[in-house]
Amino acid sequence: MMTAAQIAYLRDAYAPRIYLVEFDAYDLTADSTKTLYYSTTGFTSLPGDSPSNTHFEGRVKSALNVSRNMYSPGKIGGRSVPAFGTIKLNNVDGYLDFLQGYSLNGRNIKVKVGSGGLYSDFFNIFVGTMDQIEWSSTEVTIKIRDFQHKLDKDIETDTYTGTIEVTGTAQAGGTSTITLASSASSTHDFYKYMDIEVTGGTGYDQKRKIIAYNGSTKVATTKSSTPWTVNPDNTSLYSVYNNSNGEDRLKDKVKPLCYGDVSHIEPIEIDPSNRKYQVHNGAVEEIVGVYAGGNQLGSCSSGSYTNAWDCQADGYTWTNSGFTPSISTGTFTLVGSATTVITADVKGSKESDAFNASATYVSKTGDLVKRIVTTKGGIQVSGIDTSSFNDFDVATTAIKNGDVGYYVPEGGNILNVLDDLISSLGGFYSFSREGKLVIGVLTEPSATPVESFTEHEIMSIQRRSTSIPTLSQTTGNRRYWRQFSENDLAGAVLSDEPYKARLESQFVDEEYSGTNNISTRHLLAEAAEKIDTYLNCNCMGYEEAKRRQELYGVERDLFIVKVKTQPFMLDINSTVQIKLNRYGLDNGKNMRVVSLKEDASKNEVTMEVLG
């Protein structure tokens, strides 16, 4: 965040401007990285500076032309997009042709501005990465973008290995036994509860569970209730599987992740013989409940209930049974067999992260985002604008008070997860001028603008059409991650019609309607398309629907305004005042900045504002 002195410097149209551009380049011939330094007018750092005694050659023709958007261009709401721009270097003499032998893509670049003097007096107006170079006969254009690509990666890479513990040739076999090779473990019960498969020879293509193992005789005993169909002998080849890391059928499958408070997720069955399931690759806060065909495993202190929710709503006590949880590994084991789909309610990830020194469970949107980007995205605390997260955490009732949950059963992209979590509550994320992750949410303009623009600064203004005010807003909440159909449900659930209906609907919808005669004022007004959230409480979903209707259920102004001003003073979501003798702006109107295009070479800013 800029200091007051830096903002005052940018506001001073007469203050001298020197732009410094520093970027890393990889020498394809020498296989080494070096930093290159350029400026608008030529600059050399002093011996006490860092970097010291470094000359910034005066080749910068256009220091920075960059576009930043809250959402996709032309849209209000939806998924976040990265900032893009260009920097142009003068190459009339061909001196920069050497850059053809360098790789810039994915390397860091920063642009600073200052009046000269000490290098430390310059400050960042852009920190990001480079894409590629475009050439002309007179200039080099470097395409730049923010650091959003750092999060364009898999959220989880840990996979099940389907570990084979040992292979060999049997020495003998019986009805429910097999004598392993002499090289097998000498530790009693070493292979207990592991699976053994006859992979060749006599008894080929049979698989059984080992229930005991004698390390002295090498005899593995299998379940007597499932004897060998064909007894193994000394020609039988075998493999013993350690299912603690998933059955062989799960080999290379990405392990699941569970964050916050989720309902009816489908766990991964890692060991069918032992009825063992995994909900998260790591420790969790609690496995709240387990269901077979929607029928919760446990009992109510009075009456016959299919789930704890209804039991407790009627004032009784629910007791879980029928499964054994292991919160340290994010797994549970069923006591008995099940023939219907297994689901679970879970309070997920309980671990340490850059903001929590000890293992901690978190369930607020901002906290989940910080956990994901630091533990899975590789973002350091220094790369996060914590003040923006502090503001976001209290920006709306649903964000402040609502618990959310997100389940990733088979891997996925971090950006997709962030888009789902943040945009579902009307939020956005980006990277700041300093290269730090920023989060925010579109709300009503603030009462006090950070800048005001009048006819003296406004070069052009264009009014854009906006959506017709909505009649109502609806949110989907309390998501059931398994989409149930009638064929999935246990018999007891089928006869519990209200509960059955909830399972089949997947979401609990909350609608909020406008009260200002919208249908009379706007004959084509319609209800907004439903937004599905990850809130675990429909009451917070109601608050979010209400907020959205108050935001989108009234007439709005949307302008594209080009102003003659010093760039880099504004940010996305800043509040500005537009005052002009047009469009009903005579008395000035506070509006939110939803997009910015800044051109340092012309000292112009084009912004899209909503109010």
How does the language model describe each region?
Residues 119-136, 207:
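Beta-strand-rich solenoidal segments
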Residues 138-141, 147-192, 197-262, 298-325, ...:
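Small/polar beta-strand repeat architecture
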Residues 291-294:
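Short strand-turn-strand beta-turns centered on an Asx-Gly dipeptide
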Residues 1-2, 10-13, 20, 24-37, ...:
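C-terminal extracytoplasmic interaction modules
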Residues 130, 210, 593-595:
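Conserved hydrophobic positions within beta-strands
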